[in-house]
């Protein structure tokens, strides 16, 4: 499904690509996989490693990212009209051909686990980690931490195959919605 709101007063296009799922769809024993997988999408895609991907995005003046929420996964692109085609190509690579390079997985795991440790010492973080299990019960899809970060043990145990598999199951065009707002037309988006 494509939803388009044409706004031609500013030469910018914003895209929001939403997939069903989110961290309520994390498989048993893998809390955090939805958000972690989404967080790695812009760490290299297609022929570009993480540094090359980010450099190209900056050259184009595009902001590209991805994340997961309770009931959805999503990716966003904000691009200048004059650089829309190459920005969309980079965005498409991120969505269709994420690299999941092991060195990036390891680097992001370290950052992620540090973030989980931070959550555990902040009152709001503790609440986001503890309340869902108390309200819905451990094992319920909504019983995982509301931050979507999972647990240290689960994140440490994730493999590249886990991430590739999750991406192939949950982050595909079938059933997805693309919302586009900005200085473009449907003909430009779907030639």
Question: Residue locations for each model-derived region?
Answer:
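Non-catalytic, conformational "gating/processing" segments within enzyme and secreted inhibitor domains
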Residues: 124, 160-191
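M16 family metallopeptidases and their MPP-like homologs
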Residues: 3-5, 9-42, 48-96, 109, ...
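Short amphipathic beta-strand starts and helix->beta connectors
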Residues: 57-63, 157-166
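Peptidyl-prolyl cis-trans isomerase
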Residues: 97-100, 105, 158-160
């Amino acid at each position: 499904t494509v939803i388009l709101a044409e706004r031609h007063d500013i030469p910018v296009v914003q895209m929001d690509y939403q997939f069903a799922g989110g961290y309520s769809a994390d498989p048993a024993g893998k809390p955090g996989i939805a958000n972690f997988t989404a967080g790695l999408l812009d760490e290299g895609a297609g022929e570009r490693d993480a540094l090359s991907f980010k450099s190209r995005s900056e050259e184009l003046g595009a902001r590209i990212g991805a994340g997961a929420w309770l009931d959805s996964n999503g990716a966003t692109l904000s691009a200048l009209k004059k650089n829309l085609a190459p920005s969309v190509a980079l965005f498409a690579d991120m969505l269709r051909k994420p690299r999941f390079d092991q060195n990036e997985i390891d680097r992001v795991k370290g950052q992620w686990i540090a973030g989980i440790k931070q959550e555990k010492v902040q009152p709001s973080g503790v609440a986001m980690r503890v309340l869902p299990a108390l309200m819905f019960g451990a094992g319920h899809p909504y019983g995982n931490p509301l931050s979507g970060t999972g647990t240290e043990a689960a994140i440490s145990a994730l493999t590249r195959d886990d991430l590739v598999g999750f991406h192939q199951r949950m982050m595909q065009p079938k059933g997805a919605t693309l919302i586009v707002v900005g200085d473009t037309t449907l003909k430009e988006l779907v030639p």
